[in-house]
């Protein structure tokens, strides 16, 4: 069993999950006020507040990584040094080995993701991380509910 989580809550189970896939939400994921979401809703203050409520719950993340020892860290990188610094700070803070770090390209369309692949590939080679795609977006582009 694999659980995909942003780490907002510690998932207490009777036994450790086979694999935790941890994708924390950094500040580059905060919705922009007034834009339309992929679901067709306009981002308002309430949505931003809800997004930020548990965005980086370090206590829950620490508990999760201690209890579920088989995990990987899958942050989304938007190509900026600022986000790369946050990714590395988080990794070091939580003592996550580089070989458990899988960088995903930022983007919510097939075209945007493909445009990021070379940059992400070069960065992970330079920093000793792994790269993973976002295959659901490559396969279905902006289609929802797949």
Task: Describe the residue ranges of each PLM region.
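Conserved AdoMet/S-adenosylmethionine-binding subsite of the radical SAM
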Residues: 1-146
């Amino acid at each position: 069993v694999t659980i995909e989580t942003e780490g907002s809550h510690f998932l207490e189970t009777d036994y450790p999950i086979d694999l935790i896939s941890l994708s924390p939400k950094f500040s580059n994921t905060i919705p922009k006020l007034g834009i339309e979401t992929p679901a067709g809703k306009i981002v308002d203050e309430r949505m931003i507040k809800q997004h930020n409520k548990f965005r980086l719950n370090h206590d829950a993340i620490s508990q999760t990584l201690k209890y579920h020892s088989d995990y990987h860290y899958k942050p989304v990188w938007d190509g900026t040094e600022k986000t790369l610094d946050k990714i590395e700070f988080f990794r070091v803070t939580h003592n996550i080995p580089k070989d458990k770090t899988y960088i995903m390209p930022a983007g919510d369309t097939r075209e945007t993701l493909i445009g990021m692949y070379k940059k992400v590939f070069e960065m992970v080679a330079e920093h000793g991380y792994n790269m993973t795609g976002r295959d659901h977006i490559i396969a279905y582009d902006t289609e929802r509910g797949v």
